[in-house]
């Protein structure tokens, strides 16, 4: 604990006081009001204290002025925005986090809804070019979206469309070179590459720039990314990397609350106005129409140039201001690059502690252990992971239910992580509010849990 306290003194820069940290009492663990050790920001980020006031201001506007708040907010003098434009102030806050131009991002819908919307535009299978490359074990919602997009296009056996890449036998994450080789081998049939920026189960951070650039050597292959576990976690350069499209949620590292509003990116190369070309086909709605004509109720769709033209309906005011509250904290922390610096310090410290555990089984450790854990996440370089480490629990002697027992012990002792059955616990220190002491407490509790098995 001494080193953790030293590190907290050496690197005190966090915004912990800006967040509501659950306590043992509030979570029903004990009568103690001390905060729990929350390492679950990869699943649901904590609530910024400013969020409550932001939401209450909109509830007051609804209560006091009702429909007129769409065009004249009662708190405009204090910086509040009429509802008709509620999402627009978010764009300059969000664009730097994903490395985009402001006109390339929009907030709308939720992650899978946005993925489906983008697939309608960018997945255009032909007789010869129809395959989709994504990772085996991707988040199931992505699989469902790909599968049913194939059905929409009349493909009776979507499984024949999918190229699902996975780690080599005996390895826990996918080699970048294997992805590139798979793209090259299938270059004549691939229509779309759509991977996760950070893999939700293993925590692997894919080399987005390199993979995108390589795939674009073959001019008819488009590249999209599911950034659910990447946005707010690692720096991104979507515009400079030439990514065609991307989508994400906002309730993990962006701390916008459960079911928070989603986001999407469409590269400007696809949306530049060109009188000689029709605009991209899309799932359209009135909120993507030219705002100067939106309320004329014309039966003519003139999409707003850029990502805003992909909006369909007016966004939830409550969800939007909740996201803005958190994005303002990213700006207060001086941006995603500073967030990433602190994130690496925290996660690398956690790696150090875990690898020092007597229960950690290094790949070269050959003795039989009744219970042990390994780290699925690649950690040899900083470029291979984000905040999350995925721990895989097992036994060489047939001991069962190790992970559930460890997870329950952690929870009962106020260490909040995330279990993925049958054998994985994910821990992710969030740099905006977690401390080095949090990391120490979590790993110490993990060792205690395994002592009791």
Swiss-Prot record:
<dbReference type="InterPro" id="IPR015421">
    <property type="entry name" value="PyrdxlP-dep_Trfase_major"/>
</dbReference>
<keyword id="KW-0963">Cytoplasm</keyword>
<feature type="binding site">
    <location>
        <position position="314"/>
    </location>
    <ligand>
        <name>pyridoxal 5'-phosphate</name>
    </ligand>
</feature>
<dbReference type="Pfam" id="PF22580">
    <property type="entry name" value="KYNU_C"/>
</dbReference>
<dbReference type="InterPro" id="IPR010111">
    <property type="entry name" value="Kynureninase"/>
</dbReference>
<dbReference type="GO" id="GO:0030170">
    <property type="term" value="F:pyridoxal phosphate binding"/>
</dbReference>
<comment type="function">
    <text>Catalyzes the cleavage of L-kynurenine (L-Kyn) and L-3-hydroxykynurenine (L-3OHKyn) into anthranilic acid (AA) and 3-hydroxyanthranilic acid (3-OHAA), respectively.</text>
</comment>
<keyword id="KW-0663">Pyridoxal phosphate</keyword>
<comment type="pathway">
    <text>Amino-acid degradation; L-kynurenine degradation; L-alanine and anthranilate from L-kynurenine: step 1/1.</text>
</comment>
<feature type="binding site">
    <location>
        <begin position="139"/>
        <end position="142"/>
    </location>
    <ligand>
        <name>pyridoxal 5'-phosphate</name>
    </ligand>
</feature>
<feature type="binding site">
    <location>
        <position position="226"/>
    </location>
    <ligand>
        <name>pyridoxal 5'-phosphate</name>
    </ligand>
</feature>
<feature type="binding site">
    <location>
        <position position="196"/>
    </location>
    <ligand>
        <name>pyridoxal 5'-phosphate</name>
    </ligand>
</feature>
<dbReference type="InterPro" id="IPR015424">
    <property type="entry name" value="PyrdxlP-dep_Trfase"/>
</dbReference>
<feature type="binding site">
    <location>
        <position position="251"/>
    </location>
    <ligand>
        <name>pyridoxal 5'-phosphate</name>
    </ligand>
</feature>
<protein>
    <recommendedName>
        <fullName>Kynureninase</fullName>
        <ecNumber>3.7.1.3</ecNumber>
    </recommendedName>
</protein>
<keyword id="KW-0378">Hydrolase</keyword>
<dbReference type="GO" id="GO:0030429">
    <property type="term" value="F:kynureninase activity"/>
</dbReference>
<keyword id="KW-0539">Nucleus</keyword>
<dbReference type="GO" id="GO:0005737">
    <property type="term" value="C:cytoplasm"/>
</dbReference>
<feature type="binding site">
    <location>
        <position position="286"/>
    </location>
    <ligand>
        <name>pyridoxal 5'-phosphate</name>
    </ligand>
</feature>
<dbReference type="GO" id="GO:0043420">
    <property type="term" value="P:anthranilate metabolic process"/>
</dbReference>
<dbReference type="GO" id="GO:0019805">
    <property type="term" value="P:quinolinate biosynthetic process"/>
</dbReference>
<feature type="binding site">
    <location>
        <position position="111"/>
    </location>
    <ligand>
        <name>pyridoxal 5'-phosphate</name>
    </ligand>
</feature>
<comment type="subunit">
    <text>Homodimer.</text>
</comment>
<dbReference type="GO" id="GO:0034354">
    <property type="term" value="P:'de novo' NAD biosynthetic process from L-tryptophan"/>
</dbReference>
<keyword id="KW-0662">Pyridine nucleotide biosynthesis</keyword>
<dbReference type="GO" id="GO:0019441">
    <property type="term" value="P:L-tryptophan catabolic process to kynurenine"/>
</dbReference>
<comment type="similarity">
    <text>Belongs to the kynureninase family.</text>
</comment>
<comment type="pathway">
    <text>Cofactor biosynthesis; NAD(+) biosynthesis; quinolinate from L-kynurenine: step 2/3.</text>
</comment>
<dbReference type="GO" id="GO:0097053">
    <property type="term" value="P:L-kynurenine catabolic process"/>
</dbReference>
<feature type="modified residue" description="N6-(pyridoxal phosphate)lysine">
    <location>
        <position position="252"/>
    </location>
</feature>
<dbReference type="InterPro" id="IPR015422">
    <property type="entry name" value="PyrdxlP-dep_Trfase_small"/>
</dbReference>
<feature type="binding site">
    <location>
        <position position="229"/>
    </location>
    <ligand>
        <name>pyridoxal 5'-phosphate</name>
    </ligand>
</feature>
<feature type="binding site">
    <location>
        <position position="112"/>
    </location>
    <ligand>
        <name>pyridoxal 5'-phosphate</name>
    </ligand>
</feature>
<dbReference type="GO" id="GO:0005634">
    <property type="term" value="C:nucleus"/>
</dbReference>
